Amino acid sequence: MAKVRVYELAKEFGVESKVVMAKLQELGEFVRSASSTIEAPVVRKLTDALQGPGGNAGKSAAKPGAPRKAAPAKPAAPSPAAAARPAAPKPGAPAPKPAEAPSSTPAAPSAPSAGPRPGPKPAPKAAPVTPVPAAEFSAPAPAQPAAPQPQAPRPAGATPGPRPTPARPAPAGGQRDGGRDGGQRDGGRGGERGGDRPARPAGQGAPRPGGARPAGPRPGNNPFTSGGSTGMARPSAPRPGGAPRPGGGQERPGAPRPQGSGPGGAPRPQGGQGQGGARPTPGGMPRPQAPRPGGGPAGNRPNPGMMPQRPAAGPRPGPGGGGRGPGGGGRPGAGGGGRPGGGGFAGRPGGGGGGGFAGRPAGPGGGGGAGRPGGGGGFGGRPGFGGRPGGPGGRGGTQGAFGRPGGPARRGRKSKRQRRQEYEAMQAPSVGGVMLPRGNGQAVRLSRGASLTDFAEKINANPASLVAVMMNLGEMVTATQSVSDETLRLLAEEMNYVLEIVSPEEEDRELLESFDIEFGEDEGGEEALVSRPPVVTVMGHVDHGKTRLLDAIRKTNVVAGEAGGITQHIGAYQVSSEVNGEDRKITFIDTPGHEAFTAMRARGAKSTDIAILVVAANDGVMPQTIEALNHAKAAEVPIVVAVNKIDVEGADPTKVRGQLTEFGLVAEEYGGDTMFVDISAKQGLNIEALLEAVVLTADASLDLRANPEQDAQGIAIESHLDRGRGAVSTVLVQRGTLRIGDTVVVGDAYGRVRAMLDDNGQNVQEAGPSTPVLVLGLTNVPGAGDNLLVVDEDRTARQIAEKRAARERNANFARKGVRFSLENLDEALKAGLVQELNLIIKGDASGSVEALESSLLQLDVGEEVDIRILHRGVGAVTESDINLATGSDAIVIGFNVRAAGRAEQMAEREGVDVRYYSVIYQAIEEIEAALKGLLKPEYEEVELGTAEIREIFRSSKLGNIAGVLVRSGEVKRNTKARLLRDGKVIAENLNISGLRRFKDDVTEIREGFEGGINLGNFNDIKIDDVIATYEMREKPRG
């Protein structure tokens, strides 16, 4: 047997697919959709369930006298007209019995019946009902499926009189009693309240008077009809023969039902074997049926195998209809339409208040499945209509179906944690309506150039909230943009956090620790350490003879090759000197003395063991002398003072010793511990004594040992881009031994060592501790002062270099430019107050480029002009630099480099300004002048002269003419003037349009002369007024 799909079975049974799916779920078979297939055993089980006592869907086609016609009603139909009608009866034929009205009264307003009543007694109805004459059936209606009709309520305790038992149509969908409310089954409310239900009188299914239904429109569940009823409600008067009323009349509030398991709780009379009332199907779907004999069986009796998966519960507390089990008024899981107390699957007009398959135990008038009045909560509950007796319309739910308790949702007590969280949320800081976490002084560590997203991750906040806060604080920042340290600190203070910016050294240490690399410590024990040469840095003021001293020591002439006679790079050299009969090696590092090279001097002091402070005997202590002294003290290195130029006229070494005493350097002859040596680098005097002092200081106060067997570590002294060699770097090996072929990482550059050169230009195979070498093979030019590391793999070197580059890039982004607030940005742009000078810097060495960039960024010529360095690099000016300058209107600065190849021709063709410098202070002075040229000119008022009005002449052509005597200065034509009267300004910004002396037009009148002045259209002048003339002259800046 082929597999059958769910929708095919639904079509065969004449029901909707969701009804079959719900029944399958009740049977424990779960399907995904209506297109799912099911196995043959499941089909048989479903067929037995639907044709058995649980519902007779699909059997109506086999009934005689009724054509099979599937007419499933949509759940959202607002009227019972969607329900099928019975086959057209002939006059005198038994009419189908309408279903009883849904119960909408609470569960216990009327007393339950103690047992079966022998004879039903007629009870007075609340309002008379006009019987419908049979003559109204003028034409038979087309055959339609029978639909259960809600029956009007009857008072509890009153039983209907006996009725004849003609054949009547079976209830929709094969509905039969016995499975609902009371009856012979226990576990439901009816069984608890009244024991076994009495048999229904045979006259229950009697036809209406006249034997035919009215031919008019069938009463529908119109939610907009008056009187709180959804059908065509009629007064509840007794009808002849006790025939049931048609229509969906709804019970009045508090009106008890006559019998059965509704809210009244009294058992209903039973007629023979055929049970009265429509029995619900699993979906509450009607189906066509033929009239059935009154005493005939109403279908298979229910059996325990048709019970739901969970035992039916007892009466549920609260209003919910008189049904059993989780379904409220209907059968558990199968609340069919038609019987009182149960809502249908699709919300057919069912019993009052009870829940269907997933109906919530609702109060009187609870929301039905399709929003029908009085219906219980259906499978797909629709909002009930308002205005029903017993309270406003509710909404169907699923509380009764899956084990959740019914009744209104209760608000549980909040835990201490919830209450504390709510309290903390109320106390949290708020900026501009944005709630922020409370820091309570907690420390947050962030790296340089961190973004708001990084900050939000640290404090478990939403980055969008931080962006909104920054907008309220007047800063335009995106979530992923690098933010300056000051901005982050401002934001942290708003939330009561303590922000800690990680230093570059700490960042680098954490980065290396992530790769299990330690920098700055010797490996091995004491036995692995060997002595190494001392590293000596020569520091001092510019032109005090530092490089000349090194030339004297090395017996070379470096000074002759330096531009401007000043050192602009760090040079590293190693010399051998005989001290006390022993050959000792000393490594010297020459640092610049110009003020622009502060960073170079700081790096030289950090990478050294001993500092030689060179002071000219004729100049004494100078600003850079003090700065170099402070660098050495900060690096905690011993200092040897070399008093140079003792052979120059006016030299006074004693004065130098006295000046340095003020800064904590006390000579040994004055009782201190600092060695002073008087030398002459030019004459070569006392050079050996200076080297001896250096060696003695190193031996006395320093432990100069290192492990040569470990991986090399060092520092980059200087780097540049060589035309034939590529990126090269002068490095000082501090520990370990550097060999050719080692994988190294220097700052954000990495590579393999292809070659090494010493300070004399000779190739070397390895370099031990305290040895300066020139390294070739790096991917790019590293920065001066970057650490050198030897790693095991190229991949590790690349990862370290890339992370360092990204970190530095973020830090640069955070430092770039001047940010404007939301309030003043628009005005600044409109007024043209923001002027930028774009620069591209190219130099011969990384240290020189760094020094030039630092000096230019420190230029301050006002807030109106800003320097923006678009690019900096080492090497010649290339075509890409010219292209960048063309697109951004930038100036290219070449420091000790020239334009290469076609770059110079391209610069001339594109009109790019390329400036070349060899001395750093020349570049700084010219850039400062260019910045001042970008400033808006400032004007000042200059008084030219004053004239007193002695006479007034009137002219019909020119107006009033003032006859004046010039008191001071001179009065010129077409200059600005103001009119003073009794020392007060009467008129401003006047123009001297005419100037005459007697009858001649003149351009100026000097002091002491008379003349005539015409002030244009201004005629309000009087005798003794003073005319003061002035002009606006441009004021020089800076």
UniProtKB/Swiss-Prot annotation:
Renumbered to this chain, the Gly residues biased-composition regions fall at 261-277, 319-406
Q: Which UniProt keywords apply?
A: Cytoplasm, GTP-binding, Initiation factor, Nucleotide-binding, Protein biosynthesis
List each copy of the tr-type G domain by range. Answer: 531-703
Concerning Pfam families, the annotation shows:
EF-G_D2, GTP_EFTU, IF-2, IF2_N
Protein's UniProt keywords contain Cell cycle: no
Cite the PANTHER family for this sequence.
TR-TYPE G DOMAIN-CONTAINING PROTEIN (PTHR43381:SF5), TRANSLATION INITIATION FACTOR IF-2-RELATED (PTHR43381)
Q: What is this protein called?
A: Translation initiation factor IF-2
Starting at the broadest rank, the lineage of the source organism is:
Bacteria, Bacillati, Actinomycetota, Actinomycetes, Kitasatosporales
